[in-house]
UniProtKB/Swiss-Prot annotation:
This is Actin-1. InterPro entries: Actin (IPR004000), Actin/actin-like_CS (IPR020902), Actin_CS (IPR004001), ATPase_NBD (IPR043129). Actins are highly conserved proteins that are involved in various types of cell motility and are ubiquitously expressed in all eukaryotic cells. The keyword Cytoplasm applies. One of its GO terms (biological process) is mitotic cytokinesis. One of its GO terms (molecular function) is structural constituent of cytoskeleton. The gene is act-1. It comes from the Eukaryota. In this organism there are four genes coding for actin. The sequences coded by genes 1 and 3 are identical. There are a few variations in the actins coded by genes 2 and 4. The keyword Protein transport does not apply. It is found in: Cytoplasm, Cytoskeleton. The modification N-acetylaspartate is found at D3.
Length: 376
C-alpha cells in the first residue's frame, strides 16, 4: 500500500476559497471558490446535460447564467446542503479520492458556534463515512506554518478576521478577538465606491469581477491622508482595468480607499476597531510577561492580508500604540494566502498528532459532541 493511499486529507473551507490536498504536501492540490451556482433560466437545449447546480470553478465560469451563493458566511456554514455539495466536489472531482479511506482534517474560525463544528463532524462521519476526522483552528495552523509556537496571528480571509495570541503552542481563548469584517465586505465596499464613479456592478456575477479588480489593483496606503492628496493632485495612481466585455474602466483613489476600511471600519458604517487596534487589544488581554514575545511575532495570514503595503502599515500603526521601546515585528510570509492549509498539512502528518484524530468508533460511542472534547 503506497503512502498516498492512507495520507490524510486536509480541507481548509474558507468563506471565499476552499483549499484542499494531502497531508505532507507543501501546497494544496485544489483551490477553488466556495460557490454553488444555480441556473437563473430554464434550459431549452435538450440533451445538453445541464445540471441543477454547479460548484467552484465551473460555477465561476458559467456565472453569467447562474445565481451564485456562498454557503459559508463570516466563517460559519449557513447552508449545509450546499456545503455538502462543496465537500462532495472536493473529494470526488478535485482530489479524486474516496473519503471513506482517508482521515480528514477540517479547519474552522475561532469563536464559531459549537453547533457548527458538531454538524461538520456529523456530516463527515455519516454522509462521507470518513474513518477519522479532526477540526483545527485556522489561526493556530498559520502559526505552525510559519515555524513558530508563540505569536499573535492576524488571520483575515474572505468572511472573517481574527487575532489569536498563541503561547508555546497554546491559543489563549480569553484574548482571541474576532472581527466580522473581511474580504467580502471590501469587495462590497469597492462595488459601492465604483458606483460613485459611474460604474454599476450589481449582480452576483459582477461582484466576482469587482473581486478581481480588488485583488489586482488595490493596495494599502502607508499614510491615508497623504495618499488621498496625491490622488487628488495627479493621475499617477490611476490604473485601468478591462472588463470581460472589453470596456475599460479607470480606478484611482478607490485602489487604497477600499482596503483602508480594514484600518477604519467606520468607512463601512461599523463601530469596531480596525485590524491594528484589534491586534493590539488582543496582545493587551494577555499576561504582561508574554506581550513582548507577541509584539515581536505578529504573523499575518489569509488572503485579505495580501495587499501590498499592509505589513508596513501594520508596523507603523502598532508601533504608535505600543510602548515606545518595544520591538515590533510583523511577519508576512509570501505563501500566507495558503498558510492555514500548509499548517494543516504539517499538523496532520506529525507522528505525535496521530492519536488526536476522532475515530469513527469514538464518534459512534459519543455522538457529535465528541468534537469539543478532542479538538481545541
Amino acid at each position: 500500500m503506497c503512502d498516498d493511499e492512507v495520507a490524510a486529507l486536509v480541507v481548509d473551507n474558507g468563506s471565499g476559497m476552499c483549499k484542499a490536498g494531502f497531508a505532507g504536501d507543501d501546497a494544496p492540490r485544489a483551490v477553488f471558490p466556495s460557490i454553488v451556482g444555480r441556473p437563473r433560466h430554464q434550459g431549452v437545449m435538450v440533451g445538453m446535460g445541464q445540471k441543477d447546480s454547479y460548484v467552484g470553478d465551473e460555477a465561476q465560469s458559467k456565472r453569467g447564467i447562474l445565481t451564485l451563493k456562498y454557503p459559508i458566511e463570516h466563517g460559519i456554514v449557513t447552508n449545509w446542503d450546499d456545503m455538502e455539495k462543496i465537500w462532495h466536489h472536493t473529494f470526488y472531482n478535485e482530489l479524486r479520492v474516496a473519503p471513506e479511506e482517508h482521515p480528514v482534517l477540517l479547519t474552522e474560525a475561532p469563536l464559531n458556534p459549537k453547533a457548527n463544528r458538531e454538524k461538520m463532524t456529523q456530516i463527515m462521519f455519516e454522509t462521507f463515512n470518513t474513518p477519522a476526522m479532526y477540526v483545527a483552528i485556522q489561526a493556530v495552523l498559520s502559526l505552525y506554518a510559519s515555524g513558530r509556537t508563540t505569536g499573535v496571528v492576524l488571520d483575515s480571509g474572505d468572511g472573517v478576521t481574527h487575532t489569536v495570541p498563541i503561547y508555546e503552542g497554546y491559543a489563549l481563548p480569553h484574548a482571541i478577538l474576532r472581527l466580522d469584517l473581511a474580504g467580502r465586505d471590501l469587495t462590497d465596499y469597492l462595488m459601492k465606491i465604483l458606483t460613485e464613479r459611474g460604474y454599476s456592478f450589481t449582480t452576483t456575477a459582477e461582484r466576482e469581477i469587482v473581486r478581481d479588480i480588488k485583488e489586482k489593483l488595490c493596495y494599502v496606503a502607508l499614510d491615508f491622508e497623504q495618499e488621498m492628496a496625491t490622488a487628488a493632485s495627479s493621475s499617477s495612481l490611476e490604473k485601468s482595468y478591462e472588463l470581460p466585455d472589453g470596456q475599460v474602466i479607470t480606478v484611482g483613489n478607490e485602489r487604497f480607499r477600499c482596503p483602508e476600511a480594514m484600518f477604519q471600519p467606520s468607512f463601512l458604517g461599523m463601530e469596531s476597531a480596525g485590524i491594528h487596534e484589534t491586534s493590539y487589544n488582543s496582545i493587551m488581554k494577555c499576561d504582561i510577561d508574554i506581550r513582548k514575545d507577541l509584539y515581536a511575532n505578529t504573523v499575518l495570514s489569509g488572503g485579505t492580508t495580501m495587499y501590498p503595503g499592509i505589513a508596513d502599515r501594520m508596523q507603523k500603526e502598532i508601533t504608535a500604540l505600543a510602548p515606545s521601546t518595544m520591538k515590533i515585528k510583523i511577519i508576512a510570509p509570501p505563501e500566507r494566502k495558503y498558510s492555514v492549509w500548509i499548517g494543516g498539512s504539517i499538523l496532520a502528518s506529525l507522528s505525535t498528532f496521530q492519536q488526536m484524530w476522532i475515530s469513527k468508533q469514538e464518534y459512534d460511542e459519543s455522538g457529535p459532541s465528541i468534537v469539543h472534547r478532542k479538538c481545541f
